[in-house]
A protein has these predicted regions:
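Active-site helix of classical SDR
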Residues: 109, 144, 152
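Alpha-helical segment proximal to the catalytic Tyr-Lys
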Residues: 114, 157-161, 226
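Short, small/polar-rich loop/turn modules that mediate ligand/substrate recognition or access, typified
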Residues: 160-167, 228-230
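C-terminal helical subdomain
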Residues: 170, 192-224, 228, 237
Length: 242
């Protein structure tokens, strides 16, 4: 067993988007701890980045993939949230959230696939429990993550045709400690109370940790999960068990 749990990623190369964010950064660390090579990508100028990549840019994806000789895994971790119900969500915000969360995931799957199918591989898309059950005050975010989950299933079914296959799964966290939760809370009158309420709503009584999500991603990238594809995997402290 490695430091990343049951994951063994020796000799595997994994591209991680959103690598400057809390979850993306933790995924990069988990891949490296499990023996793999992580290529950290995010917007130009972000810290700890190997490759500058705007996930909404088709040209950026083409350029990034062209520079990689071998790819065994992809983690689409880039994402943003916008706190607003359907009446308060303006169209520009809607387009921006879907562009990063859903279009970015689509482009990643599309352009990385040719490299992955050469020897088989795994894609992990960051969805959310709010893509499974919805949320009244995150209209654009829930729509984007619901799209990510169904895109994942389509890619998984296509990837299963290849021998060896290209697996594709979605990780669905509840609220996780980090800038995104801080941003959601900051849009309210009492951020501290809101964060505490988010934690109390979880049966296990706390928010998730980026490292916990990253460990699950590492497992889904590894050969230990070879019979798992097309799945929405909640990591939510029991939130969706209700």
């Amino acid at each position: 067993m490695t430091g990343a749990g049951v994951a063994d990623l020796n000799d595997k190369t994994v591209l991680v988007t959103g690598a400057a964010g809390a979850i993306g950064k933790a995924v990069v660390a988990a891949v490296r701890k499990a023996g793999g090579k992580a290529i950290a990508s995010d917007l130009k100028g972000r810290p700890g980045i190997d490759v500058a990549l705007d996930v909404t840019s088709e040209a950026d994806w083409q350029r990034a993939v062209a520079a990689i000789d071998r790819l065994d895994g992809l983690v689409n971790a880039a994402g943003i949230a916008a706190v607003a119900n359907i009446e308060k969500t303006d169209f520009a915000t809607w387009r921006r959230v879907l562009s990063i969360n859903l279009d970015g995931t689509f482009l990643g799957c599309k352009y990385a696939f040719a490299l992955l199918r050469k020897q088989g591989g795994a894609i992990v898309n960051l969805s959310s429990v709010l893509g499974l059950v919805g949320g009244p005050n995150l209209a654009a975010y829930t729509a984007s993550k619901g799209g990510v989950s169904l895109l994942t299933k389509s890619v998984a079914l296509y990837g299963a045709r290849f021998k060896p296959p290209v697996r594709c799964n979605a990780v669905c966290p509840a609220f996780v400690e980090g800038p995104m939760v801080d941003e959601i809370a900051s849009g309210t009158k009492d951020p501290g109370t809101v964060k505490n309420k988010l934690a109390l709503d979880v049966p296990l009584g706390r928010l998730g940790a980026p490292e916990e999500v990253a460990a699950l991603c590492a497992y889904l990238l590894s050969d230990a999960s070879a019979f798992i594809t097309g799945a929405d995997v909640p990591i939510d402290g029991g939130l969706t068990a209700r």
